[in-house]
Regions:
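Intrinsically disordered, low-complexity N-terminal segments that are enriched in acidic
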Residues: 1-79
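Secondary-structure boundary elements
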Residues: 13, 80, 84, 90-155, ...
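Generic structural "secondary-structure junction" signal
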Residues: 21, 63, 78, 101, ...
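Short, charged, solvent-exposed linker or helix-capping segments at domain edges/interfaces
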Residues: 21, 82-88, 206
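Residue-level signal for pocket-adjacent positions within structured domains
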Residues: 56, 89, 145, 200, ...
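Short, charged/polar, Gly/Pro-enriched secondary-structure boundary elements
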Residues: 79-80, 203
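Hydrophobic/aromatic-rich core segments of domains that either
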Residues: 159-237
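Active-site/ligand-binding-proximal alpha/beta "capping" segment
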Residues: 264
């Protein structure tokens, strides 16, 4: 399997800013080529790369005011090994978090999924969220969490993932959020999915069913959207004028929603 991905941002920086970008594929990816550039008013800048415990690659630097262009591209051959699980994961990924209020959804989760566990539970939660939410671009706010999404019954990929994660955590299944490049996604964008830990293995869950999971390519991993944002900015304001994302695969797979799949 060969996957080619790219992303491009055009921004206006209104002052001195501390910027963190999360656009690069995760560290475990088998790269055959990669390029990343940061240009402000025609001058190129180098960013510091930081890698977290899950292989998320963050590019950080300080910049002054101006028009900024960020470009990233990569080609990945083959699949990476499945994400390892460690003893810290259940502690972190069973707790409620900013956008995944599993404590608030505990009664709902226990009522809807009583008696289910393992693969059956994962399938049931995925189908339940897919059946009850409508995918409506622009229908949610960046401050919305799983509880608000459930009440609104609509959202985008991050909202679907937050609700899946919150329900699974409420049922004592460690769950986390992953930003991915998703070949086959339409309209094309950065995509967010969930991962659930069943029997010591991380399995990818996408209740939107908008792209095959087998060809998704990990970017970053965390508790919820707060941990996997493609752009973080501190100090000055900025305007994101344009965002373009592309993800293609040499042969787009067919996804069976009942099948367990791991990101690779």
């Amino acid at each position: 399997m060969q996957r080619t991905v790219s992303s491009r941002m055009e921004l206006d920086l209104r002052g001195e800013s501390d910027l963190v970008f999360s656009m690069a594929v995760a560290a475990e990816s088998s790269l055959s080529s990669e390029r990343m550039s940061f240009v402000i008013d025609g001058t190129a800048f180098e960013a510091q790369e930081l890698v977290d415990r899950h292989g998320s690659r963050l590019h950080q630097f300080a910049a002054g005011p101006g028009s900024m262009l960020v470009e990233y591209s990569a080609t990945v051959d083959g699949r990476a090994d499945a994400a390892p699980a460690d003893d810290l994961d259940p502690i972190i990924y069973l707790r409620p978090s900013r956008y995944c209020e599993s404590d608030s959804l505990l009664p709902t989760a226990r009522y809807e999924f009583a008696g289910l566990s393992g693969h059956d539970l994962l399938t049931a939660v995925t189908l339940w969220v897919w059946d009850r939410l409508s995918y409506v671009p622009g229908s949610s706010l960046v401050t919305d969490g799983a509880s608000r999404t459930l009440m609104a019954r609509r959202g985008v990929c991050r909202d679907y993932a937050h609700l899946v994660i919150a329900l699974l955590r409420a049922l004592d299944v460690p769950a986390r959020m992953v930003a991915v490049y998703a070949p086959g996604l339409s309209p094309m964008d950065f995509h967010a999915v969930a991962e659930a830990n069943i029997d010591g293995q991380w399995w990818v869950v996408d209740a939107t069913r908008l792209a095959p999971r087998q060809s998704m390519l990990r970017i970053s991993t965390g508790r919820d959207a707060a941990d996997i944002a493609f752009l973080t900015n501190h100090r000055a304001d900025l305007i994101l004028n344009r965002l373009e994302v592309l993800a293609i695969v040499d042969e787009l797979p067919t996804d069976d929603s009942q099948q367990l799949v791991q990101l690779g």
